[in-house]
Amino acid sequence: MTVLDSILDGVRADVAAREAVLDFAAVKAAAAAAPPALDAAAALLEPGIGVIAEVKRASPSKGALADITDPAELAAAYQAGGARVISVLTEERRFQGSLADLDAVRRAVSIPILRKDFIVGPYQIHEARAHGADVVLLIVAALEQDALASLIDRTESLGMTALVEVHTEEEANRALEAGAKVIGVNARNLKTLEVDKNTFGEIAPGLPTEIIKIAESGVRGTADLLAYAGAGADAVLVGEGLVTSGDPRKAVADLVNAGAHPSCPKPSR
């Protein structure tokens, strides 16, 4: 069993437990009653290389990363530093996240929020919207093709943006076939947890110009952002490098300033 398979087993059990308490009809009603989703795609296409800053307590590869007692305060610091989008981990077992974190961050910031989790079905899509998410992560390696296409459609039908994550060219092709408009290339292989920063540069050039391209994993500082920008990234998603920085607002601001500098490569579109 791969690391991804193990995570998905836990997620399915946790979703079933939540659905036993709050059924699908109730979650759909809560999603319908939520304020309209913010336009994350537009935010990511603003001038300069965007920064998606992540609230991340732990990871399967590193274990505990940061003692985040106040996710709202951290998210507010990210926004003050110039982040375009805030990513919030909601997976409980390996990442120590929660929907309560999503709620807290939603109350604290006025920019789009990404629910970062392992989505396995429509319940979680409506759940994300009900808790204020504007973007949902869909991982190609975790989904059959029909389910991927269906979940992209459902996400967009609720006014949200689907960030479709890939790690190989085959997965990128699947994402395009399913209708993805925003594609994240993860340098980390979720089946082995190994990181290869060259992955983005191998996959992104083959994506259509109109696709919004996000580089995920491996950003430790401005040099990494500039390298990803040179390979065609519209934005970078950064978690560990921010929560371990000691000054998250400054760490975000440094990345944002590098991405806005005239010498930074600009995406062609």
Curated annotation (Swiss-Prot):
It catalyses: 1-(2-carboxyphenylamino)-1-deoxy-D-ribulose 5-phosphate + H(+) = (1S,2R)-1-C-(indol-3-yl)glycerol 3-phosphate + CO2 + H2O. GO terms for biological process: L-tryptophan biosynthetic process. SUPFAM superfamilies: Ribulose-phoshate binding barrel. Gene3D superfamilies: Aldolase class I. Its EC number is 4.1.1.48. One of its GO terms (molecular function) is indole-3-glycerol-phosphate synthase activity. CDD domains: IGPS. Pfam families: IGPS (PF00218). The keyword GTP-binding does not apply. Pathway: Amino-acid biosynthesis; L-tryptophan biosynthesis; L-tryptophan from chorismate: step 4/5. Keywords: Amino-acid biosynthesis, Aromatic amino acid biosynthesis, Decarboxylase, Lyase, Tryptophan biosynthesis. InterPro entries: Aldolase_TIM (IPR013785), Indole-3-glycerol_P_synth (IPR045186), Indole-3-glycerol_P_synth_dom (IPR013798), Indole-3-GlycerolPSynthase_CS (IPR001468), RibuloseP-bd_barrel (IPR011060). Belongs to the TrpC family. This is Indole-3-glycerol phosphate synthase. The gene is trpC.
